[in-house]
């Protein structure tokens, strides 16, 4: 935060501004660690800092808390991204954006399980990397839910068992108590707006996942979270 207690996240807005100091710091140190705001855009951070060896994206209980850039006197292209979610059983994931761009992934409708990666992985943008690592398909290019036939023994995020598509014709039958938890991604309504539209209250064991599929159709699916 600045002197007015406003949140800042660009290096240019910080005191001291690290950018004009980097040249001298690189002369005096083999390795430099820079802790940045979790709100920073990683691409902009890389442009500002020059050669970066590693980026550590650190979440605690699925809330991104720290972005740490590791610089040294060698040139790394691209840097390795390390994604961790502390105070959880989530395994770490690492990758880099060059490999991410080179990978391919299948897009398809939900299978038996829908998977939601943790915040660190979403911040890193390692979408095809996690799909490739765990053998997953993705719902759509801009919908960051994944899907598989079976539950994974370990996964850095949440897993949901699919019950089926949900709409205004079957919602009262499937949710007679009118209670559900709602998550929306790449969907025209927020979670709160969707709950209001269907007259739902928070709670219960069911999760409604709202998203757009690869054909850009807005859909809702009823699921149960797997513990």
What residue spans do the PLM features occupy?
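SAM-dependent transferase fold signal centered on methyltransferase-like domains
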Residues: 1-227
């Amino acid at each position: 935060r600045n002197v007015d207690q406003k949140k800042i996240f660009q290096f240019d807005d910080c005191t001291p501004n690290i950018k004009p100091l980097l040249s001298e710091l690189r002369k005096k140190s083999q390795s430099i660690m820079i802790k940045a705001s979790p709100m920073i855009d990683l691409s902009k951070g890389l442009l500002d800092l020059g050669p970066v060896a590693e980026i550590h994206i650190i979440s605690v209980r699925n809330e991104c808390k720290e972005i740490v850039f590791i610089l040294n006197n060698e040139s790394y292209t691209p840097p390795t991204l390390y994604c961790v979610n502390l105070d959880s059983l989530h395994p770490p994931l690492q990758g880099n954006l060059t490999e991410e761009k080179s990978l391919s992934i299948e897009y398809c409708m939900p299978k038996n399980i829908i998977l939601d990666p943790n915040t660190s992985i979403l911040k890193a943008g390692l979408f095809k990397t996690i799909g490739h690592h765990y053998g997953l398909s993705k719902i759509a290019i801009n919908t960051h839910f994944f899907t598989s036939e079976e539950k994974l023994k370990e996964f850095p995020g949440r897993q949901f068992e699919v019950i089926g598509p949900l709409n205004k014709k079957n919602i009262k039958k499937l949710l007679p108590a009118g209670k559900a938890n709602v998550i929306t991604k790449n969907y025209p309504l927020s979670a709160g707006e969707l709950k209001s539209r269907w007259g739902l209250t928070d709670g219960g064991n069911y999760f409604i996942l709202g998203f757009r599929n690869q054909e850009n159709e807005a859909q809702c699916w009823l699921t149960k979270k797997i513990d």
